[in-house]
Amino acid sequence: YDDSYRVFSNNVSAPWVDSNNKIVIDDNIMKWVDQTKKYTDKGYNNKSSLWDSTWAADQGPSGKVFGFFYSTWGINFTLLGNSLATPVKEGGKEEVGNGIYGDYAVCEGPQSYYWGGTWICAAAGTDNANLVKDVMKTLCCDKATMKKITEDTQDYTNTTSGMNEIASSNFKSDFLGGQNHIKLFAKSAPKISMKNISSYDQGLN
């Protein structure tokens, strides 16, 4: 039932905590509450929650759920695995014919939103500062490296020009039935607003 939450929470009109250190519940959060109750009452969702076993099973061969709100990283790292009838760890292959691999596709949602990201942190006091710097710069700033990450993992990486190049190329995802989902992400990403993020989001969301 909570898949759609980030569409609302990422499009609020103000941060969670105001200048007086007072928690403010945005109208958009209450719209999500109202919609969730309505959809639950009408049976539009399966009453499961993110990451629980029912939610995961609903994404597989026996699932009856029409669709899911997801992150870019979740497509390959979570949805793909859940789609397989025989998991890779049990000898299954990531290929058409194993469960519903190849049956999914990505479509544009009602609003652009983000769901976390992939982070890299360095330890304070490291005696390998230059090496750490090179690793971080390569993974986060080197266009060729980031394009390769996208091509290998299907995730959306931190290079606008690189993602636009992949979007206009013949790149395709076998898991997504041959779709170039990066083309859709490249269109949606510029519409994401980060102006109301705060240090309280992780706890309050």
What is the meaning of each model-derived region?
Residues 3, 27-35, 55, 64, ...:
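Extracytoplasmic/secreted proteins, especially bacterial periplasmic and envelope-associated proteins
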Residues 72-98:
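A ligand-binding cleft/hinge motif common to bilobed small-molecule-binding domains
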Residues 18-50, 93-106:
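Glycine-centered hinge/linker elements that transmit conformational signals in sensory
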Residues 41-44, 62-67, 100-104, 128-134, ...:
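Loop/turn elements at helix/coil->beta-strand transitions in domains of secreted/extracellular proteins
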Residues 1-22, 37, 63-67:
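Extracytoplasmic/periplasmic solute-binding protein
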Residues 66-71, 105-108, 120-122:
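Structural recognition of the beta-strand scaffold that forms the well-ordered cores
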Residues 52-68:
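Short helices/loops that flank or line small-molecule/ion binding pockets
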Residues 78-81, 110-205:
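C-terminal lobe and pocket-closing loops
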